[in-house]
């Protein structure tokens, strides 16, 4: 049980997918201008990453390895992610039309979020078991969500701040992301995974 908790904390804080491994930067910059959009994207990403990690493990263990089709790993993971995203899009459309409109193009873009594919491939490379794969995917999604929501709150504050003209917009956002990354470096050594 302690190993699972350490894996979760390590994935969320120490090896954060956005600030340490630099995966998922496109949605990180694209969806972070408003906090409500970031929260919606976070829920969708948590669901997709966790489910994609689970299904990728099952596809690898019960389909690709027994049939000696390991060379199709990346392609099969992309297919699994696309199916999970389509399912998520249908669920969000049925349950919350306002969130569906708010997320707009960003929901289908989860398919191309390299963090989702990165989680599946890292699960395979790190030889995680069933529960470890789920926890790793969930932790990566929680870390992504934490950083995305924090960053969106900071960007909303910066929109109302007196920022010099050359730094307005993307420039100050990149500086802020860099400072967040430095702050997360403080967690290095907290957990060895």
From Swiss-Prot:
InterPro entries: Ion_transpt_RnfA/RsxA, NqrDE/RnfAE, NqrDE/RnfAE_oxidrdctase. Keywords: Cell inner membrane, Cell membrane, Electron transport, Membrane, Translocase, Transmembrane, Transmembrane helix, Transport. The chain crosses the membrane at residues 5-25, 39-59, 72-92, 102-122, 134-154, 171-191. It is found in: Cell inner membrane. Pfam families: Rnf-Nqr. It is a multi-pass membrane protein. It comes from the Bacteria. Its EC number is 7.-.-.-. GO terms for biological process: electron transport chain. One of its GO terms (cellular component) is plasma membrane. NCBIfam families: PRK05151.1, rnfA. Part of a membrane-bound complex that couples electron transfer with translocation of ions across the membrane. Belongs to the NqrDE/RnfAE family. The complex is composed of six subunits: RnfA, RnfB, RnfC, RnfD, RnfE and RnfG. This is Ion-translocating oxidoreductase complex subunit A.
């Amino acid at each position: 049980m302690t190993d699972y908790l350490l894996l979760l904390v390590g994935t969320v804080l120490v090896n954060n997918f956005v600030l340490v491994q630099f995966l998922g930067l496109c949605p990180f910059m694209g969806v972070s201008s408003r906090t409500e959009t970031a929260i919606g994207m976070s829920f969708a990403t948590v669901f997709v990453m966790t489910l994609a990690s689970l299904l990728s493990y099952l596809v690898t263990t019960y389909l690709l390895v027994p049939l000696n089709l390991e060379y199709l790993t990346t392609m099969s993971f992309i297919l699994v992610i696309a199916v999970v995203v389509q399912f998520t899009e249908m669920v969000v459309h049925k349950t919350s039309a306002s969130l569906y409109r708010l997320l707009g193009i960003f929901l289908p873009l989860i398919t191309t979020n390299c963090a989702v594919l990165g989680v599946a491939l890292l699960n395979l490379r790190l030889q995680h078991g069933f529960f470890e794969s789920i926890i790793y995917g969930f932790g990566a999604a929680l870390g992504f969500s934490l950083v995305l929501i924090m960053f969106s709150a900071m960007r909303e504050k910066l929109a109302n701040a007196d920022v010099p003209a050359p730094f307005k917009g993307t420039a100050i956002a990149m500086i802020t992301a860099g400072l967040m990354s430095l702050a997360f470096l403080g967690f290095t050594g907290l957990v060895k995974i």
